[in-house]
């Protein structure tokens, strides 16, 4: 297990003061609901005191309500006790990156992250966005393993295991560092979606074709693979 640094000073008061695990999927281009540009804009507005929180919807409220039950069901099905719920960890190298883990359990004598999820979808493998979030948590905690119990479609319960992937963690953390730099400098990351271009250039698209989100994801993955091969 890595030598980690847990927060010794008061944890951040608001989302504008740090990059959390919920931001990881956006930073690596795996959040279909938000782009890095939109995330930076939100963080900047929070820091400026001009941001208005959107109203929660039924699914969001259900997720918050069901989260503790998912952790309890994980313990019921696996026999593993979940401790340290909502514990805060800070990344050992980047003080502006941290995470609140849903819980911590002890597996074969070593601590592991527990990240609960509820979804109306069914998937045989964890979506890449969740993997990015969990790898960010593993990078912050220094743990080598995470369990992701998922309550699917209101009737199915499945527990996924995610092992630490240092190379992918570096990719995720570096992307978060990039976005945070834009937040502090009050600049914006490169536009990645049609909405980004519309927000940035509302009156002029210049006649250029925009890459699809899927194409952008593929380019991001190719860059990561190229870096991984170079470092190997």
Give the location of each predicted region.
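Long, amphipathic alpha-helical segments that form or neighbor coiled-coils/leucine zippers used
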Residues: 187-215
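Residues that form generic nucleotide/phosphate-binding pockets
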Residues: 27, 39-43, 77, 175, ...
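Short helix-capping and hinge/turn segments at secondary-structure transitions, especially at repeat
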Residues: 178-189, 227-230
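Nucleic-acid nuclease catalytic cores
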Residues: 59-61, 65, 76-183
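Charged, glycine-rich intrinsically disordered N-terminal tails and low-complexity linkers that flank
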Residues: 1-69
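Contiguous, amphipathic alpha-helical segments that mediate oligomerization or scaffolding
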Residues: 207-232
């Amino acid at each position: 297990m890595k030598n980690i640094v847990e927060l010794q000073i008061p944890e951040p008061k608001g989302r504008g003061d740090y990059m959390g695990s919920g931001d990881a999927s956006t930073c690596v281009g795996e959040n279909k609901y938000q782009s890095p540009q939109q995330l930076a804009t939100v963080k900047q507005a929070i820091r400026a005191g001009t941001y208005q929180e959107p109203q929660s919807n039924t699914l969001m409220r259900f997720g918050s309500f069901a989260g503790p039950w998912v952790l309890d069901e994980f313990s019921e099905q696996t026999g593993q006790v979940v401790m340290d719920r909502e514990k805060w960890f800070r990344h050992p190298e980047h003080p502006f990156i941290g995470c609140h883990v849903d819980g911590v359990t002890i597996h074969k004598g070593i601590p592991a992250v527990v990240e609960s999820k509820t979804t109306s979808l069914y998937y045989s493998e964890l979506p890449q966005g969740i993997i990015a979030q969990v790898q960010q948590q593993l990078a912050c905690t220094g743990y080598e393993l995470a369990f992701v119990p998922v309550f699917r479609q209101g009737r199915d319960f499945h527990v996924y295991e995610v092992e630490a992937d240092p190379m992918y963690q570096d990719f995720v953390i570096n992307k978060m560092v990039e976005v945070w730099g834009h937040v502090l400098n009050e600049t914006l990351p490169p536009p990645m979606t049609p909405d980004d271009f519309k927000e940035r250039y509302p009156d002029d698209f210049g006649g250029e074709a925009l890459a699809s989100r899927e194409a952008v994801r593929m380019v991001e993955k190719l860059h990561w693979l190229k870096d991984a091969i170079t470092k190997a």
